[in-house]
UniProtKB/Swiss-Prot annotation:
The lineage of its organism: Eukaryota, Metazoa, Ecdysozoa, Nematoda, Chromadorea. Induction: Present at higher lower (>95%) level than cpar-1 (at protein level). Disruption phenotype: RNAi-mediated knockdown impacts chromosome segregation leading to abnormal chromatin distribution. Disrupts mel-28 localization to kinetochores. Leads to cleavage furrow regression and failed cytokinesis during the second embryonic division. RNAi-mediated knockdown abolishes the localization of hcp-6 at the centromeres of mitotic chromosomes. This is Histone H3-like centromeric protein hcp-3. It comes from Caenorhabditis elegans. Keywords: Centromere, Chromosome, DNA-binding, Kinetochore, Nucleosome core, Nucleus. The keyword DNA-binding applies.
């Protein structure tokens, strides 16, 4: 019988090599998975996939000469783990893109400023001109009824207009608030996130008017003239000169805020701070 000792030693050495590779794989996987939130991070899952690919290649190179049962089992185990994480990453990417597309379609199909008030978050109590016609009629009827104390039962029997007899009034489940000294019930105004900003953006995009009111700006100019010059009290300024000053001042302010906003964006912030304006002055307004 031939001596099988070298073959046994070679098999044992191969098994030890596989064991060392698996121990290093376990250590590296623990290093990646110990980071909090690695499951929700694409970078963490990609690192784990790269580690599994690397050790899979090492096992295949180590078993290139002789495929034993241990090699085949370990290679299948590492390959299965790698495939699981690849599938998980692909599913997460698909879900992310699906949610993004759904949000884009929802945003394109609805208008935040002109759309209907389906969530009862928009209030029409800040002016009668912005109030729907049916609510305007209801509020006027309530005021007439509350102010006129001589109304009899005949006036309470039904509305004076027969066309409005079958229409129901506003829901009693709406949140209302009573103001002191007033008989009319007003609702608290609430905005959805981003709705007020969209209204202001569309307002300033459609108009070419000045941003500052003319009367306060004119008072400010006259006050500066009176306090800064010895003969300011006797001076008079034309309206077109005030308009020119206002246009120049607003152009300067808009340019300054644009530059400061770029500086805050460069600092990876969305909030404009005083340090951004100071840095803009140092960079672009050295003469001031």
């Amino acid at each position: 019988m031939a001596d099988d000792t070298p073959i046994i030693e070679e098999i044992a050495e191969q098994n030890e090599s596989v064991t060392r590779i698996m121990q290093r794989l376990k250590h590296d996987m623990q290093r990646v998975t110990s980071v909090p939130g690695f499951n929700t991070s694409a970078a963490g899952v990609n690192d784990l996939i790269d580690i599994l690919n690397q050790y899979k290649k090492e096992l295949e190179d180590d078993a290139a000469n002789d495929y034993t049962e241990a090699h085949i089992h370990k290679i299948r185990l590492v390959t299965g783990k790698r495939n699981q994480y690849v599938l998980k990453l692909k599913q997460a990417e698909d879900e992310y893109h699906a949610r993004k597309e759904q949000a884009r379609r929802r945003a394109s199909s609805m208008d935040f400023t002109v759309g209907r008030n389906s969530t009862n978050l928009v209030d029409y109590s800040h002016g009668r001109h912005h109030m729907p016609s049916y609510r305007r009629h209801d509020s006027s009827d309530e005021e007439n009824y509350s102010m006129d104390g001589t109304n009899g039962d005949g006036n309470r029997a039904g509305p004076s207009n027969p066309d409005r007899g079958n229409r129901t009034g506003p829901s009693s489940s709406d949140r209302v608030r009573m103001r002191a000294g007033r008989n009319r019930v007003t609702k608290t105004r609430r905005y959805r996130p981003g709705q007020k900003a969209l209204e202001e953006i569309r307002k300033y995009q459609k108009t070419e008017d000045l941003l500052i009111q003319k009367a306060p700006f004119a008072r400010l100019v006259r006050e500066i003239m009176q306090t800064s010059t010895p003969f300011g009290a006797d001076c008079r300024i034309r309206s077109d000169a005030i308009s020119a000053l206002q246009e120049a001042a607003e152009a300067f302010l808009v340019e300054m805020f644009e530059g400061s906003s770029l500086i805050s964006t460069h600092a990876k912030r969305v909030t404009l701070m005083t340090t951004d304006i100071q840095l803009y002055r140092r960079l672009c307004l050295r003469h001031l």
